[in-house]
Amino acid sequence: MVEKQKINEVIVVEGRDDTANLKRYFDCETYETGGSSIDDRDLERLKRLEDKRGIIVFTDPDFQGERIRKIIMQAVPNAKHAFLNRDEARPKGKGSLGVEHANFEALNQALAEVFGGEKVTDEFGSAKTQEPSSDRSSVSKKELLTELTQTDLMSFGLVMAADSRKRREFLCEQLRIGYANGKQIKKRLNMFKITKEQIENVMKNY
């Protein structure tokens, strides 16, 4: 029997189909919000889980999923976050976007990004060493400590440009941090400690 890679943190998902898909590949426990609903009792439980085990928010890459993520982000600021691109969460037939539709490679990459590594496990369950990705490890300590400014965003055309939305969509998808609008983008990039060097490298391909 193949041994699945264990995820110590509790993964927060929207429904049981998301749970089932994750458990196909990983030894993990999930907390289901029950679709788009999340209340104060859920948030209190998630706070306790974060204190005891840590949580990874892994909601769907759609409006409701981002709404739930933002609510949890405000209530549990230390929570980790995993993201799927919209294409990775698209069903083969009709239906809405969801973690339940993602294949192993997409799930594995999303979880690896949480820990700053290349991959959590291979498809057969063998654990891999979680090494920092090359673009992050090459960044100096000084750069990591420097937060992005509104001027930086403007210089990359992420705000105040005719195609700013498309630029943000491209950048956020490549960095796997979930879409952020013009008001959110600076906070989102700084939260994930994204540097100007990383943005430059990504936007070269825009």
From Swiss-Prot:
Q: Which PANTHER family match?
A: RIBONUCLEASE M5
Q: Does the keyword Cytoplasm apply?
A: yes
PROSITE patterns reported in the protein's UniProt record:
TOPRIM
Q: Which residues cross the membrane?
A: none
List residues binding Mg(2+) 1. Answer: E14, D60
Name the encoding gene, please.
rnmV
Q: Which UniProt keywords apply?
A: Cytoplasm, Endonuclease, Hydrolase, Magnesium, Metal-binding, Nuclease, Ribosome biogenesis, RNA-binding, rRNA processing, rRNA-binding
* Function of the molecule: Required for correct processing of both the 5' and 3' ends of 5S rRNA precursor. Cleaves both sides of a double-stranded region yielding mature 5S rRNA in one step.
Entry's Pfam families?
A: DUF4093, Toprim
A single GO CC term for this protein reads: cytoplasm
Provide the species name. Answer: Lactococcus lactis subsp. lactis (strain IL1403) (Streptococcus lactis)
| Catalytic reaction list | Endonucleolytic cleavage of RNA, removing 21 and 42 nucleotides, respectively, from the 5'- and 3'-termini of a 5S-rRNA precursor
| EC top class, as a word | hydrolase
Question: Family per UniProt?
Answer: Belongs to the ribonuclease M5 family.
Q: Which GO BP terms sit in this record?
A: rRNA processing
Residues reported in the UniProt entry to bind Mg(2+) 2: D60, D62
Q: What is this protein called?
A: Ribonuclease M5
A Gene Ontology molecular function term for this protein is:
metal ion binding
Cofactor: record remark: Binds two Mg(2+) per subunit.
